[in-house]
């Protein structure tokens, strides 16, 4: 076990990921079925393209695939429930028996309910289940839940975000929200925390959270790193969105060294390559 002070395992729907036996983080592959995602908008909007990408990630060894039908990039407009369902449900239905865990990236309770009916294993919510009905949607479902910190909403979150102390403020929110979700009947073993890189944070805020990522891992829950291809990497490297692999891998290893338990990425094979080297050197 490379991360200390965690629950024994992560209960994620049909799957039980035993932290006691793991020597590397889980890899969560991103599958956006949206036309306007900041990174791959439109590439996987068709069913066939999405399924091919999912198969590529599965062949690469992905632990869980995160399927999203609405972009939450800065300034993104909300989409109607019917459109989101049309985008994600056929993909979940086609892939649910392939032996890999699946997550639904949504904040809409009805989307959660419909995805869970089809057997999705995890709900990944940028609103941390704060929308009315979201807690009820996952109550007693036995699914994993990812609780993310976001200041304001996707439309306004990058308009001059401010904190007294970004690390302390995000830590406090995550700790309090996790306990509130537990009080609703979700067990600690189902919960993953996400500090929300790029969601209501300036470049300085993001860099501080990366430098002090270990402070989130001290909260007693597994912590997810979601930094793949994000604008902070472009601001530092000067690279366009599809050229940010190298800084993304560097950030990943920084966070893993501090206890990241899940790495959410667009670049599954390359992330695995980096983690294999990290693991080999660590267990030598």
Language model features: what each stretch is:
Residues 4-14, 22, 39-53, 72-94, ...:
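Active-site-adjacent loop and "lid" segments of alpha/beta metabolic enzymes
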Residues 52-68, 258-259:
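Catalytic domains of carbohydrate-active enzymes, especially glycoside hydrolases
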Residues 187-190:
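Short acidic capping loops at alpha-helix termini that bridge into adjacent secondary structure
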């Amino acid at each position: 076990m490379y991360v200390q002070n965690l629950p024994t395992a992560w209960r994620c729907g049909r799957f039980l990921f035993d932290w006691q036996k793991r020597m590397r983080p889980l890899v969560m592959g991103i599958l956006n079925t949206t036309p306007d995602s900041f990174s791959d908008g439109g590439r996987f909007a068709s069913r066939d393209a999405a399924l091919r990408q999912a198969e590529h990630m599965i062949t690469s060894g992905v632990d869980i695939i995160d399927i999203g039908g609405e972009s939450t990039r800065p300034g993104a407009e909300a989409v109607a429930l019917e459109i989101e369902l049309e985008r994600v449900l056929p993909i979940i239905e086609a892939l649910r028996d392939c032996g890999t865990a699946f997550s639904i990236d949504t904040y809409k309770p009805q989307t959660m309910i419909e995805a869970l009916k089809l057997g999705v294993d995890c709900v990944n919510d940028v609103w941390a289940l704060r929308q009315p009905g979201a807690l009820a949607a996952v109550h007693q479902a036995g699914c994993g839940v990812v609780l993310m910190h976001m200041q304001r909403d996707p439309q306004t979150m990058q308009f001059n975000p401010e904190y007294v102390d970004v690390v302390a403020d995000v830590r406090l929110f995550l700790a309090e929200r996790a306990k509130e979700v537990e009080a609703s009947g979700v067990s600690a073993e189902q919960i993953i925390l996400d500090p929300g890189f790029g969601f209501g944070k300036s470049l300085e805020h993001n860099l501080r959270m990366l430098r002090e990522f270990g402070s989130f891992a001290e909260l007693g829950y597994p912590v997810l790193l979601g930094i793949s291809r994000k604008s902070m990497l472009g601001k530092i490297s000067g690279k366009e969105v599809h050229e940010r692999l190298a800084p993304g891998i560097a950030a990943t290893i920084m966070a893993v060294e501090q206890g990241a338990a899940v790495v959410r990425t667009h670049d599954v094979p390359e992330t695995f390559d980096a983690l294999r080297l990290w693991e080999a050197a660590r267990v030598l």
